Amino acid sequence: MSHAMDLLHVFILAVIQGLAELLPVSSSAHVILAEKLMGFDPSAPNMTFLLVMLHTGTMFAVIVYFWHSWKKTYFFDWQSFKQRAWYVLLATAITGVLGLLLQSLIKHVFFGGVSSFEIEHLFSNSKLMAAALAAAGILIILSSRLDRGQQGDIRLPSAMIIGAVQALCLPFRGFSRSGATISTGLFLGISRQKAEEFSFALAVVLTPAVIVKELVRLLHAQHATTGATHLALGSLLLPSIFGMVFSFLTGLLALKWLSAWLEHGRWYLFGIYCLAFSGVVLTLA
């Protein structure tokens, strides 16, 4: 981020993050494209710090929005809580293990041992993002076509499968995590509401890990630059808090929108949007 960053830029990025992070359309693709169009370097330390704050805002939006339904589903009684918590933690563990294995495979087999930060930069390539968006769009449309209003619940095998699918999304900028996990739930016969609740329960557990990863990236970048970066971060604190608040508010609106469209059988429209946006990304590449 540079001296040209102002509250308007922060507001725009916060709104994009709040909408795209919680709708199944890939926040990373939207935020990276917006940053590039505004002339900012997505890999700059200050942009990473802002992204951490925006992620924090959307995480709290998820907690606030789903708290009431989670109380009925996850905290109904102690036995129910233990079972649901086990499913969430197991799925997250599978995501973590498979994600690390996939990253190692990509790192050593395809890119000859480059650093994890360089791999993420490579996967920010516009053509790869467009391909990931198109794949996500097709997955969402197919799951919508196969959805017949089923009323299944999360079980151990489905939790494991969803966790594995979530891991496959991690390296690919443009492949929506929520889109993939909800679609997988629908493929497995899980009800729309249960698939949505489980997907965002996973998000609340996974997001702190993402935030820590971004902070590690920030520290890594700071060590490679001068002390001027520290001064820039200090000046960014208040604008970032401003952005966090708006990503929280926008996130609440996005979740309400998502729930309504999912419940009323309009899930496929997000897939159409992903396909259209992949074309936009390719055009602007």
Curated annotation (Swiss-Prot):
Gene Ontology cellular component?
plasma membrane
Reaction catalysis annotation: di-trans,octa-cis-undecaprenyl diphosphate + H2O = di-trans,octa-cis-undecaprenyl phosphate + phosphate + H(+)
Please classify the protein's predominant subcellular localization into one broad category.
Answer: membrane
EC id: 3.6.1.27
* A Pfam short name: BacA
Which terms are listed as keywords in the entry?
Antibiotic resistance, Cell inner membrane, Cell membrane, Cell shape, Cell wall biogenesis/degradation, Hydrolase, Membrane, Peptidoglycan synthesis, Transmembrane, Transmembrane helix
Which domain of life does the UniProt lineage start with?
Bacteria
BP-aspect Gene Ontology terms: cell wall organization; peptidoglycan biosynthetic process; regulation of cell shape; response to antibiotic
HAMAP family xrefs? Undec_diphosphatase (MF_01006)
Q: What does this protein do?
A: Catalyzes the dephosphorylation of undecaprenyl diphosphate (UPP). Confers resistance to bacitracin.
Anything else known: Bacitracin is thought to be involved in the inhibition of peptidoglycan synthesis by sequestering undecaprenyl diphosphate, thereby reducing the pool of lipid carrier available.
Stated name of the protein: Undecaprenyl-diphosphatase 2
What is the organism field in this record?
Acinetobacter baylyi (strain ATCC 33305 / BD413 / ADP1)
